[in-house]
Curated annotation (Swiss-Prot):
GO terms for cellular component: cytosol. It comes from Legionella pneumophila (strain Corby). The gene is rsmA. It is found in: Cytoplasm. SMART domains: rADc. Its EC number is 2.1.1.182. Specifically dimethylates two adjacent adenosines (A1518 and A1519) in the loop of a conserved hairpin near the 3'-end of 16S rRNA in the 30S particle. May play a critical role in biogenesis of 30S subunits. Its main location: cytoplasm. The keyword Cytoplasm applies. The keyword S-adenosyl-L-methionine applies. Keywords: Cytoplasm, Methyltransferase, RNA-binding, rRNA processing, S-adenosyl-L-methionine, Transferase. InterPro entries: KsgA/Erm, rRNA_Ade_diMease-like_C, rRNA_Ade_Mease_Trfase_CS, rRNA_Ade_methylase_Trfase_N, rRNA_adenine_dimethylase, SAM-dependent_MTases_sf. This is Ribosomal RNA small subunit methyltransferase A. Belongs to the class I-like SAM-binding methyltransferase superfamily. rRNA adenine N(6)-methyltransferase family. RsmA subfamily.
Amino acid sequence: MRHSPRKRFGQNFLQDKYIINEILRAINPLADDNMLEIGPGLGALTQPLLQKLNRLTAIEIDTDLQNYLTRLPVSQGKLNLIPADALTVDFCQFGPHLRVVGNLPYNISTPLLIYLLKFITCIDDMHFMLQKEVVERIAATHGTKAYGRLSVMLQYHCEVEYLFDVPPEAFEPKPKVDSAIVRLTPYRVSPFESVNTEKLENIVAKAFAMRRKTLTNNLKGIISLSQLNDLGIDGGKRPEQISVAEYVQLAKFISN
């Protein structure tokens, strides 16, 4: 199919067979898996997944691609295509033990990752191709430059595994940046205390609002220096020096 990639959907189509096989190996799909693909595009992953699965749900916003995907011989009786924007979908409607995969468009990857956290109880694992810089941010440890809001929120909910890099040559058209594959596995038993996710997101967003300022400055009016000291958290540190566990502690304190 000749399809001109649409800039507004951030479309870059995966074409490299070796990379496709490596992604499939990482996902390891089994016939009865409850699998959902976000943004199947021209079906580079969709088609080999359909060969291994009894059924696949896919969410695609582009009408041209919707028509193309439903006409594929391998799709017949197996592909459940949802014509929608993934940011508007209730993922829990597809049942428990959901395995989510996708080559996420760069322009919506961060909001979509945060959005998916709302449905974390319905998800077994997620495998995504993202801009390499985004995967580095997700996997970053505190005290590093890449560590930020995305690192804290995703690491609070999931075990993060940075799997491998994907060069621009694997796509058509070639993106200007490298990509990478990440595996996110929601915790069965969390290493962190349970806390209100909204409170955690709010405190993390405020803490990272101005990265060069100290935690005390960024959280002025929310928590005092003496209260931070009582929690054993150094208010003189910058937000990227505060661990996920410490942000959880802060959210818990504010919730009470």
